[in-house]
């Protein structure tokens, strides 16, 4: 099943992080996302370019609405013509399948609004 068609599952502190094999399976479905480590926590991160601040804010709101609907929330940095989105699972201080699902959903929103 395509990641954009999946739903986030409730995540508890004892939930397993995605392993190397699962990352190898999931990451090709969101190739524009980088896996970065910040303060010892792996995250999915992508910078989106938009035409101006108004479009950046609108994109931020759309991502926020999807995050609320799924109960899984990113870090968002909105600037003129740019939005940086970071997904990771706070409860496990690492990456969970939910992060890959939400990255794919973020890509779908970006495609709808013309963000690159």
Swiss-Prot record:
InterPro entries per record: PCD_sf (IPR036428), Pterin-4-alpha-carb_dehyd (IPR050376), Pterin_deHydtase (IPR001533)
Pfam families, per the entry: Pterin_4a (PF01329)
The protein's Enzyme Commission number: 4.2.1.96
GO function terms (MF aspect): 4-alpha-hydroxytetrahydrobiopterin dehydratase activity
SUPFAM superfamilies noted in UniProt: PCD-like
Keywords: Lyase
GO BP field: tetrahydrobiopterin biosynthetic process
Catalytic activities: (4aS,6R)-4a-hydroxy-L-erythro-5,6,7,8-tetrahydrobiopterin = (6R)-L-erythro-6,7-dihydrobiopterin + H2O
This protein's record includes keyword Nucleus: no
Source superkingdom: Bacteria
UniProt-listed PANTHER family: PTERIN-4-ALPHA-CARBINOLAMINE DEHYDRATASE-RELATED
Family, similarity comment: Belongs to the pterin-4-alpha-carbinolamine dehydratase family.
NCBIfam families the UniProt entry points to: PRK00823.1-1 (NF002016)
Name used for this protein in its record: Putative pterin-4-alpha-carbinolamine dehydratase 1
Organism: Gloeobacter violaceus (strain ATCC 29082 / PCC 7421)
């Amino acid at each position: 099943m395509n990641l954009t068609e999946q739903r986030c599952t409730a995540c508890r502190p004892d939930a397993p992080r995605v392993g190397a094999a699962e990352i190898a399976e999931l990451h090709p479905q969101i190739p524009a996302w980088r896996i970065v480590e910040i303060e010892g926590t792996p995250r999915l991160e992508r910078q989106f370019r938009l035409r101006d601040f108004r479009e950046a804010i609108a994109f931020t709101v759309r991502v926020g609405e999807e995050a609320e609907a799924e109960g899984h929330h990113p870090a968002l940095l909105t600037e003129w013509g740019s939005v940086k989105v970071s997904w990771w699972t706070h409860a496990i201080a690492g990456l969970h399948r939910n992060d890959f699902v939400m990255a794919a959903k973020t890509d779908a929103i970006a495609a709808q609004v013309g963000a690159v």
